[in-house]
């Protein structure tokens, strides 16, 4: 009988103000897997984009500067996405919410880096797309069609990486505003 009273007293205690409620955690945790999925997509798309473009750049012996720019931006975007993916996975595994364990400085830095990566990716993709269209490499005589199709595939994946970066930028902007409003 005493044992049942002890068990019921454990469950009758009011919730602690220091421990987030289950409802709050359920509202936050759906966003963490979303950001992890976006980071995975960023990494995969930017990896494919820069590896295909590096192959194209090797074929033209590095003579076209916008292809070099696209490869460089792809490498930077891929490295940034991998670093953010690692940190996001660490936060999800650790069980941190968007406000616990993440400093406001990190929120600012993530938002700024996401924005910069987004703009750099669309800049690199548009520079390469313009080059493919204007340079005459993809002429009507059929020469360079393999080069053109690979370049087009790389631009497509760079654009998909841009979409993933912009979606994660929206989420990190949400986290930043939420962090600012709590302060």
Curated annotation (Swiss-Prot):
Its main location: membrane. It is found in: Cell membrane. This is CASP-like protein UU2. InterPro entries: CASP_dom (IPR006702). Belongs to the Casparian strip membrane proteins (CASP) family. It comes from the Eukaryota. PANTHER family: CASP-LIKE PROTEIN 4A3 (PTHR33573:SF50), CASP-LIKE PROTEIN 4A4 (PTHR33573). Keywords: Cell membrane, Glycoprotein, Membrane, Transmembrane, Transmembrane helix. The chain crosses the membrane at residues 34-54, 73-93, 119-139, 157-177. It comes from Selaginella moellendorffii (Spikemoss). Residues 1-33, 94-118, 178-183 are cytoplasmic. The keyword Glycosyltransferase does not apply.
């Amino acid at each position: 009988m005493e044992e049942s009273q002890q068990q019921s007293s454990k469950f009758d205690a009011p919730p602690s103000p220091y421990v987030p409620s289950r409802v709050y955690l359920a509202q936050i945790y759906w966003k963490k897997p979303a950001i992890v999925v976006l980071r995975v997509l960023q990494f995969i798309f930017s990896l494919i984009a820069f590896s295909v473009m590096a192959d194209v750049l090797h074929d033209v012996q590095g003579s076209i500067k916008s292809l070099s720019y696209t490869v460089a931006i792809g490498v930077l975007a891929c490295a940034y996405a991998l670093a953010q993916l690692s940190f996001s996975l660490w936060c999800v595994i650790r069980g941190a919410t968007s406000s616990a364990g993440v400093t406001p400085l990190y929120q600012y830095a993530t938002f700024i880096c996401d924005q910069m990566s987004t703009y750099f990716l669309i800049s690199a993709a548009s520079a390469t797309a313009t080059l493919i269209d204007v340079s005459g490499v993809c002429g009507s005589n059929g020469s360079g069609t393999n080069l053109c199709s690979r370049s087009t595939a790389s631009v497509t994946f760079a654009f998909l990486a841009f979409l993933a970066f912009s979606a994660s930028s929206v989420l990190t902007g949400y986290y930043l505003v939420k962090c600012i409003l709590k302060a």
